């Protein structure tokens, strides 16, 4: 007696969208944007291309949605850090949370920061937005928080430091030049040095 064909599992809209985003995130992390095929994604999801396009009208829409999800997860990781810590302790705990994400989702992290479809306004907006939210997350709950919006020099310095964090984290992922704890301490000391210059009275 021939085996019965396996029935496809019907997912509700939210489950299907989540499935497609996860497949896309993996694909775009492993391959370049141009190498990712909608046909392959639909085949892997066991749905038609038409149904995939119902959720995401273009490959670019799917790519951008995946980036937004990665950005939200990264910011959420930092918001889990207690806010009732001394500034130096909060910086170190926040960096630990950040590096946890970098370690656990290395491909997604690199994909978020390096992009893959050239200069795209929507992708640039996602990256700019997550950088702003991360800068705020690193100082939220500390006496330095109001200064991020109220003191332009501090805002510029923190965002410049965040760029250093991004490049140092990717270099660490790719080359492992130092232990993770040493990287955390290096990044922490650089930010604390910035704070001492901009607002020494708040760290005394």
Feature-to-residue mapping (PLM):
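Amphipathic alpha-helical linker/stalk segments
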Residues: 66-93, 138-142
């Amino acid at each position: 007696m021939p085996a019965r064909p396996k029935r496809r599992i019907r997912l509700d809209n939210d489950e299907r969208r989540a499935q497609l985003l996860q497949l896309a995130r993996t694909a775009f992390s492993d391959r370049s944007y141009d190498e990712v095929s909608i046909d392959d994604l639909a085949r892997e999801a066991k749905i038609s291309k038409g149904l995939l396009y119902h959720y995401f009208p273009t490959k670019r829409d799917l790519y951008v949605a995946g980036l937004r999800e990665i950005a939200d997860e990264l910011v959420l990781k930092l918001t889990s850090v207690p806010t009732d810590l001394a500034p130096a302790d909060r910086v170190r705990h926040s960096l630990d949370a950040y590096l946890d994400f970098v370690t656990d989702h290395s491909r997604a992290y690199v994909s978020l920061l390096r992009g893959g479809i050239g200069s795209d306004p929507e992708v640039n907006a996602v990256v700019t937005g997550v950088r702003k939210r991360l800068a705020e997350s690193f100082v939220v709950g500390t006496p330095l928080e109001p200064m991020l919006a109220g003191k332009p020099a501090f805002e510029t310095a923190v965002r410049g430091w965040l760029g250093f964090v991004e490049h140092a984290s990717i270099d660490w992922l790719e080359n492992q030049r130092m232990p993770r704890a040493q990287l955390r301490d290096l990044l922490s000391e650089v930010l604390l040095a910035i704070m001492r210059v901009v607002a020494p009275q708040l760290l005394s």
